[in-house]
Amino acid sequence: MADSVPALHPDVAALAPLLGTWVGEGSGEYPTIEPFGYTEEITFGHVGKPFLTYAQRTRAADDGRPLHAETGYLRASAPDRIEWILAHPTGITEIQEGQLTADGDGLRMELVSSSIGRSGSAKEVTDVGRSIELRGDTLTYTLRMAAVGQPLQHHLSAVLRRVR
């Protein structure tokens, strides 16, 4: 029996423009590390349930070594509200909640942490915020972070383009 793609759940219809694979480049900085560049691939998918699946991988721009990964789920809790549930292999979990603004050409999400969990060996992360904008086939984001005694501040930004 051939696998068929289920219909997109109506609760996440406003998030449909995110579906697909995105690749691009970004840069990072934080007071405790040297600035760095990276390449990134993000995939949003769905299984017909009221959430999108999410997988992200980054590599160092200079030598291609793996840097970071995240996986999780993006849910629409109300027509203009979203929840992003994320797990990191560094021992961190995040629940982010925020505002979704959708228009004819794309969407914008403003998210803040409502909960951060960490394993006993994970570095201290106390707050994370994300601003994500989609216009046509271009996805941009910035990430703010409070960690290891530092206040909430800019950490990452990237521009990605849809490849499929």
UniProtKB/Swiss-Prot annotation:
Binding site for heme b: H155
Pfam families from the UniProt entry: THAP4_heme-bd
Short motif (GXWXGXG): ranges: 20-26
GO molecular function, one term: peroxynitrite isomerase activity
UniProt keyword Metal-binding present: yes
Pathway info: Nitrogen metabolism
Cofactor: heme b
Flavoprotein keyword on record: no
Alphabetical keyword list: Heme, Iron, Isomerase, Metal-binding
Cofactor note: Binds 1 heme b group per subunit, that coordinates a highly solvent-exposed Fe(III) atom.
Signal sequence range: none
Residue ranges crossing the lipid bilayer per the database entry: none
Superkingdom of the source species: Bacteria
This enzyme's EC code(s): 5.99.-.-
Coiled coil: none
CDD domains tied to this protein: lipocalin_heme-bd-THAP4-like (cd07828)
Catalytic reaction equation(s): peroxynitrite = nitrate
InterPro entries, per database record: Calycin, Nb(III)_bact/plant, Nitrobindin, PeroxynitIsom, THAP4-like_heme-bd
Role: Heme-binding protein able to scavenge peroxynitrite and to protect free L-tyrosine against peroxynitrite-mediated nitration, by acting as a peroxynitrite isomerase that converts peroxynitrite to nitrate. Therefore, this protein likely plays a role in peroxynitrite sensing and in the detoxification of reactive nitrogen and oxygen species (RNS and ROS, respectively). Is able to bind nitric oxide (NO) in vitro, but may act as a sensor of peroxynitrite levels in vivo.
Domain writeup: Forms a 10-stranded antiparallel beta-barrel structure able to accommodate a hydrophobic ligand in its interior. In fact, this fold hosts the heme group, which is located in a wide surface cleft.
Family, per entry: Belongs to the nitrobindin family.
Protein name: Peroxynitrite isomerase 1
Native species: Mycolicibacterium vanbaalenii (strain DSM 7251 / JCM 13017 / BCRC 16820 / KCTC 9966 / NRRL B-24157 / PYR-1) (Mycobacterium vanbaalenii)
